[in-house]
């Protein structure tokens, strides 16, 4: 990793299923030797370190539990924002906390807003467009009888499953994507946008398209007017965020979300 940083000028690393790296004798140890090695390395300790802070094992969900020098994919941000914009009950208190930097997760050990990598979609799962267009996954093309991929997507199709010519449904979907982009880019923390979401890319409801090297997973850059409008909207949000320091504070705003009903 040090060699890659020095020779290729890569400024950071993202660790997949990073909780695995902290396991000692099957248990997750936040003081594991791996973290000691990273902290003591004169090169790696100075680069951006981003964790996917969970794995498949017992006790593997470690959002908020990594050392202060790390940033983390905030899975609780993703889940809360999805639930809020599909009008799930009792989500407002937690939504406010996520918008303000998730201090309930990161304030304990004095971490800053950059500890939270905020995201709504990623390379796994639904695209933003599919998140507002499908209630169910449609992975039949993967050849596993639609058994693969996450079944609990916290998505809402706005009234019709998949593509439709109904004007009101399509307008609502466009608004929902804007709602989520605005939330993401106006939140404290680091915003992460999955490439293609800014032009409403679809995978036709496939939320596990790793095996699809075809139109299902490709980005079509022949944009229609709705896609161009969404791209312009996202671009303006990014400029707004860059222009206003209050949207990327150096210190957390302290909140304590109420438990859900």
Give names to the regions the model predicted.
Residues 206-227, 231:
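Extended hydrophobic/aromatic segments used for targeting, binding, or gating
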Residues 228-249:
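Catalytic cores of secreted or luminal carbohydrate-active enzymes
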Residues 19, 55, 199:
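Active-site-proximal loop/turn and secondary-structure-junction residues that shape catalytic pockets
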